[in-house]
């Protein structure tokens, strides 16, 4: 699953993103952030971090540098016992 997601992200970066232009308000870009988050934290946690990042990408956010956190152990979502 991880390889498929990374392949889709690479496809987006090389074929779709150039058509949209450089309009990302964050560094690294959201697609690069997604690749790093999925590689660092695995598929589920990486997708969760990517979702949170994309939600922040809106006109009321200044953007800027937003790196993938090294640890997300403080997240309530992933600490719940099922």
Swiss-Prot record:
**What is the top-level taxon of the source organism?**
Bacteria
* The keyword Nucleus is assigned to this record: no
Which residues are the signal sequence here? none
Localization, per the record, is: Cell inner membrane
Q: Which InterPro entries match?
A: Membr_insert_effic_factor_YidD
**Keywords, in A-Z order:** Cell inner membrane, Cell membrane, Membrane
Q: Name one GO cellular component term.
A: plasma membrane
Classify the protein's membrane topology as the record does.
Peripheral membrane protein
Which family would the database say this protein is a member of?
Belongs to the UPF0161 family.
Q: What does this protein do?
A: Could be involved in insertion of integral membrane proteins into the membrane.
Q: Which PANTHER family is this protein grouped with? A: MEMBRANE PROTEIN INSERTION EFFICIENCY FACTOR-RELATED (PTHR33383:SF1)
Q: Known HAMAP family for this protein? A: UPF0161_YidD (MF_00386)
Q: Which NCBIfam families match?
A: membrane protein insertion efficiency factor YidD
Q: What is this protein called?
A: Putative membrane protein insertion efficiency factor
